[in-house]
Design a protein with these regions (language model features):
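Conserved N-terminal segment of class I S-adenosyl-L-methionine
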Residues: 2-125, 129-133, 252-257, 265-273, ...
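Active-site micro-motifs of SAM-dependent methyltransferase domains
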Residues: 42, 119, 137, 167, ...
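Glycine/Thr-rich phosphate-binding loops of Rossmann-like dinucleotide-binding domains
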Residues: 94-96, 140, 169
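Short N-terminal helix/helix-N-cap motif within the alpha/beta-hydrolase-1
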Residues: 125, 140-144
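Residues lining the SAM
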Residues: 133-136, 162
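Short beta->alpha junction loops/turns
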Residues: 135-138, 201
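S-adenosyl-L-methionine-dependent methyltransferase catalytic module, highlighting the catalytic core
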Residues: 143-144, 148, 154, 158-279
């Protein structure tokens, strides 16, 4: 399902006054059915009350879809409604918060604006804070998106980012980067970074569970014999560690994982080999 323009939709002034052309940052005029850039002439439709700043069709996610909770700390910040928050990649939030603009590339239950995080359709220095949870691994150019966030934040504005490090492939094909701490700091090097730490939802135990679940799911999808699936599930961390330390032969199930189809191996591979030629 994709959106189509609705000429009888209006934008509230509180939202319209935040918006700018994503291409040139020019002022936008009009509010019934479409917005027009007064500088470059770009035209952007309003669909069901939501300004659309993408050129391609936009999918509508069923209203009953609910994304993962933000967690008490960030929900309390939004509940207080202090200052204006931009929530990038908000997904299907459990509730709508005042003074929070939900930004997405699909239309979810509370989406306010549709666009591209690499070219935010907002004026300079209008937000007091930005939340971006589990977004940056899905961006083609994280450094550019970071620069855009910095542009739309007020001086002293706050940023909270959660992003992947050791995570299997998810939301394919738009999972581009898993970043080390050094990588995350590089993306946001123009900010005054206060800390870059492992939050509770990214602890090693969660990572281990995510990887193990992905491996077992890949075996099931491959149609591997139940004996092979059970063999892998029954191995211990100690067996794999001893193998890595080159003290023992491969654990039971090693060959079953080695025999997975290439597309299934890509979900949780240690790395990739690329071969190319100059075109």
């Amino acid at each position: 399902m994709v959106t189509t323009p609705n000429e009888h939709q209006f934008l509230p002034r509180s939202l319209r006054d935040l918006l700018a052309c994503p291409d040139c940052h020019g002022a936008l005029a009009g509010e019934q059915g479409e917005l027009c850039c007064q500088n470059c002439g770009g035209i952007f439709p309003i669909c069901n009350g939501i300004p659309i700043f993408l050129r391609e069709p936009v999918a509508v996610v069923p209203a009953e879809h609910e994304s993962n909770a933000l967690g008490p700390e960030f929900e309390q910040i939004l509940e207080r409604g202090e200052g204006l928050t931009l929530h990038l990649g908000a997904g299907g939030s459990a509730r709508r918060y005042r003074n929070c603009i939900e930004f997405e590339h699909k239309i979810f239950r509370h989406t306010d604006v549709i666009g591209d995080a690499h070219a935010l359709p907002f004026r300079d220095e209008v937000f007091d804070r930005v939340f971006a949870f589990n977004v940056f691994e899905h961006l083609r150019n994280p450094a550019l998106a970071a620069a855009e966030i910095r542009r739309v934040l007020k001086p002293g504005g706050r940023l909270v980012v959660h992003t992947a490090f050791l995570q299997p492939l998810h939301e394919a094909p738009h999972h581009y980067f898993n970043a080390t701490e050094a990588g995350v700091r590089e993306w946001f090097r123009d900010f005054a970074i206060e800390h870059c730490e492992v939050s509770g939802n990214f602890s090693p135990g969660f990572m281990l569970g995510f990887i193990a679940a992905t491996l077992l799911e890949a075996l099931r999808e491959s149609g591997a014999p139940r004996a092979d699936q059970s063999e892998v599930a029954g191995t211990t961390l100690g067996q794999w560690a001893e193998f890595w330390w080159k003290k023992n032969a491969p654990p039971p199930g090693f060959n079953a994982l080695l025999s997975l189809a290439p597309e299934l191996q890509k979900r949780v591979a240690a790395g990739f080999e690329l071969r190319a030629r100059k075109s």
